[in-house]
């Protein structure tokens, strides 16, 4: 009698490799590894899954879909969780979940498995997303069920012929994609410890960064980055190029004690050189193209959207409604920002746009001034009238 199929989100690491061995007792395991820009050896991971016991192994390059459908909306919404974290891991979980569900449908699987522990946010993100996309699918979390110590897991792996990675003594837990790199555990768990240089992987320290500044022109069309220094490229490629360029200058290091969805505080080290550079540049183009009312209202929704994404609710109607509003605001967000990369900072030093609402003739204090200053008298009287009336009535 054939077994039921289970779709396993497979990373190639110890946890999900052991999960294959554990799951194959009751299921035919289909391993799925997705490339969202982490730079792994995908062919090795594909073969390892089969070697460990999966009946099928999928490797999917979803960098472009991730960039266009998940990263771009977050960029346009200036999505920072708690004003610091650009949602590196939180953004990739919805697209990974979507692909897992698609493969479950293609293969006739009734169950999806992931390698998350019972302590983190990702278990919630995967399971809420999968339930939103297909409530009939069952989800299991082997690592959460085991409750093994690391030593017990290693012993199980050795007993069952699962290769134990050579770098297993690395104290850090790293997650990486196009939008950045997240690192936790080890000495980072004590928030009084300064993060050592070994904890960073894609950025130079300020001390190691070049002593000469570098400039890059980033061009936006309807809020989407489309070119670097006049060279058009796909969004995923543009982000990757900026990760290297801005990372060289030490841009995008973030040390954050954040409030996790599961109720605890966690100290995380993020490296987001491309993300921070693009978020900075995009905001400056918005500043010269959006009317005041949109500029003031949009951040309110941006903060709420950041919380929704972080808290596993990408597929919630509230998220999609806010994203629709954000998209509507981007129609005239066209232009180029000149960004100075130097010693850990990405600073916009010049900007231009064919839809700029900045009128130099209105702003200037020279003889070219076209602002009607005589109109200010009546404006001030009417603007202050409610306050004046309140004082007359209540401050007797």
Swiss-Prot record:
The protein's matches in Pfam families, at most eight in alphabetical order, are given as: Arginosuc_syn_C, Arginosuc_synth
- KW Cytoplasm (keyword) present: yes
Q: What class of enzyme is it?
A: ligase
Q: Pathway it belongs to?
A: Amino-acid biosynthesis; L-arginine biosynthesis; L-arginine from L-ornithine and carbamoyl phosphate: step 2/3
rRNA processing listed as a keyword: no
Residue sites binding L-citrulline per the record: 85, 121, 125, 173, 258, 270
Q: Which GO terms describe its molecular function?
A: argininosuccinate synthase activity; ATP binding
PROSITE patterns the record matches: ARGININOSUCCIN_SYN_1, ARGININOSUCCIN_SYN_2
Identify the GO cellular component terms for this protein: cytoplasm
Domain of life of the organism encoding this protein: Bacteria
Instruction: Give the taxonomic lineage as stored in the record.
Output: Bacteria, Bacillati, Bacillota, Bacilli, Lactobacillales
Gene source species: Streptococcus mutans serotype c (strain ATCC 700610 / UA159)
Residues the entry annotates as binding ATP: 9-17, 115
The protein's name: Argininosuccinate synthase
Q: Where in the cell is it found?
A: Cytoplasm
HAMAP family reported in the protein's UniProt record: Arg_succ_synth_type1
